[in-house]
Amino acid sequence: MKNIKKAIISMIAIVGLSTNVNAFEGLSVGAAYSSLDFSTSGSEVARGAEGGGAMTVNKTTKTGSGDIGSIFAEYSFAQGSTIGIDYISGSTEIGKASRTEAGTTSGTVTASAAISNPMTFYVEPTYMVNDVFGVYVKTGATSITVQPKEVADAGNVVTSTYKDKDIWGIMTGVGAKYYVGNFFVKAEYLETEFQTYTHTSTTGDK
């Protein structure tokens, strides 16, 4: 998997634990709605029937989009800058491709990959234009679990087994926020580029 481009349309939170110095300073918790566009690329070096045949290289690139929700907690300083953590529960498929096995065993093998439970740690250096409106840059690190899987349409076709693996990505973006009483709204554009997942399967594929 190569990268995920993430555009957050809106984010609403309830601000708590504010101080008398600045009504926006303190701990905030809330929920976010995100509209995602992602692109993934992958390749597999297959060793043929039961791991003993000639090696072949299968490559694919996939793009997609989706809408997700997340929860977050963050702390804002009196100047307006913020540190926080964002968490998404669940999993989603990010790519699928098929190949045809021939020889002593024949059939179609479908490989897919899913990601689950993304968690992002972030900072938002902020410039407050006035008392209620600010703009910021955002950067952070995101951890996700990659879950590859292979299935075959025939019982005599040997499939590979891959391990789930946690990988990290670097997130960057820009945004703006607006405060209304003890509430605030954010609009952001973010991009995250992840590490490459690599693994040698139980049959020698990788």
Description of each model-found segment:
Residues 1-26:
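Cleavable N-terminal export/targeting peptides
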Residues 2-6, 138, 186:
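A general lysine-centric signal
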Residues 36-68, 160-168:
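Surface-exposed strand-loop-strand hairpins of Gram-negative outer-membrane beta-barrel proteins
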